[in-house]
Swiss-Prot record:
Family as reported in the entry's similarity comment: Belongs to the heat shock protein 70 family.
Protein location: Plastid, Chloroplast
Cellular component terms per the entry's GO annotation: chloroplast
Gene Ontology MF, one: ATP binding
Lineage start: Eukaryota, Rhodophyta, Bangiophyceae, Cyanidiales, Cyanidiaceae
Gene3D superfamilies reported for this sequence: 1.20.1270.10, 3.30.420.40, Actin, Chain A, domain 4, Substrate Binding Domain Of DNAk, Chain A, domain 1
Record's keyword terms, sorted: ATP-binding, Chaperone, Chloroplast, Nucleotide-binding, Plastid, Stress response
CDD domains given in the database record: ASKHA_NBD_HSP70_DnaK-like (cd10234)
Database matches in PANTHER family: HEAT SHOCK PROTEIN 70KDA
Keyword ATP-binding: yes
NCBIfam families reported for this sequence: PRK00290.1 (NF001413), PRK05183.1 (NF003520), prok_dnaK (TIGR02350)
This protein's name: Chaperone protein dnaK
UniProt-listed InterPro entries: ATPase_NBD (IPR043129), Chaperone_DnaK (IPR012725), Heat_shock_70_CS (IPR018181), HSP70_C_sf (IPR029048), HSP70_peptide-bd_sf (IPR029047), Hsp_70_fam (IPR013126)
Keyword set includes Chloroplast: yes
Organism the protein comes from: Cyanidium caldarium
Amino acid sequence: MEKIVGIDLGTTNSVIAVMEMGKPAVIPNSEGFRTTPSVVAYAKNGDLLVGQIAKRQAVINPSNTFYSVKRFIGRKFEEINEENRQVTYQVNKDPSGNVKIYCPFKNKDFTPEEISAQVIRKLTEGASKYLGEKITKAVITVPAYFNDSQRQATKDAGKIAGLDVLRIINEPTAASLAYGLDKKNNEKILVFDLGGGTFDVTILEIGDGIFEVLSTSGDTHLGGDDFDKKIVDWLVDEFKKSYNIDLSKDKQALQRLTEAAEKAKIELSSVSQTEINLPFITATSEGPIHFDKSLNRAKFEELVSELIARCKIPVENALKDAKLNKSDINEIVLVGGSTRIPAIQNLVKESLQKDPNQTVNPDEVVAVGAAIQGAVLAGEVKDILLLDVCPLSLGVETLGGVMTKMIPKNTTIPTRKTEIYSTAVDNQTNVEIHVLQGERELAKDNKSLGTFRLDGIPPAPRGVPQIEVTFDIDANGILSVTAKEKTTGKQQSVTITGASTLDKDEIQKIIKEAEINAQEDRKKKENIELKNQAETICYQAQKQLNEFKEKIDKNQYKRIEDLIAKLKQAISSNEYEEIKNLMEAIQKETMEIGKELYSKDSKNTKNSDVIDADFSET
C-alpha cells in the first residue's frame, strides 16, 4: 500500500512524518535532521538551495534567500504591509494585486506557492529515499485560522511539488491527533499553537477515537518572527544611539541581526542572560565596527510584552465560543517552537490556572498528527473520526454593502448551506455574487474570496426572481459556491480559489517549470558526482603509477599519464561525455596493469625455493 505522508509546512521549519509499523515516525531529511528550515535560496550561478544549506548562506546573499514565505501565501499585497517590512528580500505586487517574490540572480518573480513547493519537494524527496518508495500523496497542515485562499494556496504548493494533496488539516487538530491517539477517556483539551508566523488556539473534545473541534480562534499576524523583530528593532536603536548609524538600511547587517535575535530568543528560554556578538557589523572611514550587547530575560519580556498580551485574546475567544470555563479544560497542549518561551508558558498557566502538558515535542507533533490523518485516509488506522470546523464565518455581500453570513464560524465541516436571495432593482437580468469571509458587519471590512456572475435571469420586478445560493465546504475547509435561478434552472458554480491564488493554467505551467528545474537540479547533481568520481580515479591512477613505476612498461606508463592529463582537462572544462569515456579508458588501463603485476608475482612465487619443515607433536 502506498504511503501517505504528513507534512507540517511551517513558517520557520518544516517536518515530514509517516506511519510505520502502526506508529507515527518523523522522517529525517537528507542531512539527517528531523526539522528542515523553510528557507529557499538561489546562488549566483543559479543553483537552487533549500533548507539548512540555504539558511547558512543567508547573511552573504540576503536578496536571494527567501524565508517566512508562509506569511505571504494566499494573501493580497495590501494585506502584508507589516510582514513585507520584516524580510530582506524584495516583495512585489503583480497587476492583480497578488504577492510576487523577486529573485535578482534569476531576474524572475516567484509566487509564494512556488517557493513553498521547493521546501515540500525537498521533504518528499528525502522521505522517498528513506522509505525506498516514491512519495506522491500527502496530508498538509495549515494554521486553523488560515482563510479559504490561504488553504487553497497551500494545496497548490503541494501540487506544484508533484503531490496529490489528499487533505488540508488544521495544525492544532493534527496536534490533538498525535496527543490523543491512545486516549480512551473523554477529555477537553486546549491546543495553544504559537509558531514562527501564526498563532492558533483550538479547543477539542477527544475520547474513544472521536476528535471533535469545539472552537478555534487565532491571529495569522502573530508568531516567533514578530518576537525576533522586537529584538532586532531594539538592537538597531541601541546601535544608532552608540554610533549614529541606522543598520536597518543595510540588508546584510539586517540579516545578521535577525539571525542573532532568533539565537538570543532561543537561548533565553533556558538561560537568564545571553550575549549578542556581531563582529564587523559595519564600517566607517575610521575602520570596522563590532557590536556587543547583553540581553537578559527581563528585558526580552519587556520588549515583547505587547505580543504576549495579544496571545491572551484568542484563548478567551476560544473558551467563549466553545461555551466553556477555564476549569472545564482537562489538558493544555503546547505546539510550535515559540511555546518554549517561559513568558508564554507562564501566560498559559495564569490564563487557564493549569500547568501545560509537556509530553509532546512542539516542533514535531503537528507533522506526526498529519501522518496519523494520512494513515486514516489510507485505511491503516481505523476507529478515528475527526470533526473539524471552519475558522471564520462565510457569507455574501447584500444590498447596502452588508455581509450576510451563511455559514457561521466554528461550524463543523464538511457542511452545506442554501439560502434564497433576489434582485435589488426591476428587470435585473444578472446578479454578481461577492463571496466573503470574516466576522465584520460590512462587506468591505471582510476578506474577499472572489466574485462571479449569474446571467440569464428573466426580467421581473425586484424581489420576484428567486436565486438559490449554496455554500459547500469540503473536509479541507475549501469552499464551493453555486448560484441557481429557480424559474429557468440557470446555474453558475465556482470553487472559490481565492482572489490571490493561482488559476489552473498557471498551476500547470508552474508544475511543468518545477519538473524541468527538478530534472536540471538532478542533472547538476549527477554531473558533480561524476566529476568527484573522475577526481578520485585520477588520484588513484597517479598513485598506482608512482607506486609501480619500475614495474610498468614505459609506453603503458606514458599512455596512462596522458589519459590522466586529458581527464583533468575534461573535468575543468565540464565535458561530461568525455569525462565518462576517459574514466572508462583509465580504468581499463589500470586493470591491465593490475593483471600484469599479479601475473608476474604468481610466476615469481612458483619459481621461488620451497622450504620443507618438520613438525613434532608437543
